[in-house]
């Protein structure tokens, strides 16, 4: 059955092959996802000794930077889906890295960086900087600058 289906489909293969080639080579979404995974691996390797993921480190940083943001503000700033944000926030709260006024409440209104969270950022800083340099060196300084500009432009654009 498989061979018969393959033979039957082979007549249209050139069209689908061109389509698949176009998408796999030119799709910005595919390329950005791949870039994200590669760069994330660089950071994850450096942050591993600190028992924190890049997503968690980033979340801690943004919480500290925004000074007691609401989960909605965090989600908007990071462009992260609600379930991922909630999962990581709960983990950071359980680990004592993030403070929430009342963790027994159904809904968390505001979160803040705890003293342990500040120490975690400080202890991981040298390795974060090493990851930052490694990623920047791989991409090149010009690409890195252009990427920052592109993200800022897209972030400010209406959706």
How does the language model describe each region?
Residues 27-30, 116-117:
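A ubiquitous short alpha-helical element
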Residues 1-21, 126, 141-159:
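C-terminal regulatory/oligomerization modules of transcriptional regulators
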Residues 20-23, 30-33, 37-84, 95, ...:
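N-terminal helix-turn-helix DNA-binding core of bacterial DNA-binding proteins
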Residues 6, 90-149:
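Charged, amphipathic alpha-helical coiled-coil/dimerization segments
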Residues 35, 39-42, 78, 120, ...:
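Alpha-helical linker/hinge and terminal dimerization helices associated
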